[in-house]
Amino acid sequence: MTQLHQLISLLHLASPSLPIGGFSYSQGLEAAIDCGSVHDAASAERWIRDNLLHVQAQCEAPLWLLLHRCWKAGDAAQVRTWNDWFRATRETSELRLETEQMGWSLSRLIAQMEWGAPVLRETLAALSPVCLPTAFTAACVALQVEARDGLAAYCFNWAENQVAAAIKAVPLGQVAGQHMLRRLHCAVLDTVDEATRRADATPPQLSTFSPMLGLLSARHETQYSRLFRS
């Protein structure tokens, strides 16, 4: 597959139009807005950048790389192990249901689009529940997208969803959101680099320590007025 074909596949996977429901989640951002921790463009950008560098880069992003390697090697047992491990690290019911719903939607799409070899689709279908990183890495391997490229798209898509949530809930203007997203480019690249370092370590250096995110997510479950499901 040529680099251009890989780029098109990557754009497809990272598209906001991918029908997996990412737009309906804020991952604690709405609760941070409700309690006043996020209240303008600067605080929203700080929240998203810190989440990328100190949460995503330490757990989900390196795990994403490990899953990509497992799919590429055809190691179904290790795929299941990492999928179950990631699900167990979701601290609240909202965060757990988020990754399960999006993972299920993407795995169903992979089956309907017939992406990848039958054995990949069968392995994915056998996982229940399936988490989003597991399904997304399966799609990348099926479409021959390289690991770091796929992770960069995954992290950018996450940041894009966070900016969209901030625009709706703070609220912010569309241009302010685009300025914010542009300034987050370097944070996305730094996240990929840190995730690579952690995934390459022996054993892999994964950290799920994010107490404020867990508390805000738990608070969001009983928040009086909500736009988002997390």
Swiss-Prot record:
Role: Required for maturation of urease via the functional incorporation of the urease nickel metallocenter.
Pfam families: UreF
Top-level taxon: Bacteria
Gene: ureF
Cell location: Cytoplasm
The organism of origin for this protein: Cupriavidus necator (strain ATCC 17699 / DSM 428 / KCTC 22496 / NCIMB 10442 / H16 / Stanier 337)
Family label: Belongs to the UreF family.
Protein's recorded name: Urease accessory protein UreF
Classification via InterPro entries: UreF, UreF_sf
UniProt subunit comment: UreD, UreF and UreG form a complex that acts as a GTP-hydrolysis-dependent molecular chaperone, activating the urease apoprotein by helping to assemble the nickel containing metallocenter of UreC. The UreE protein probably delivers the nickel.
GO cellular component, one term: cytoplasm
Keywords: Chaperone, Cytoplasm, Nickel insertion
Subcellular location, principal: cytoplasm
Any GO MF annotation of the entry: nickel cation binding
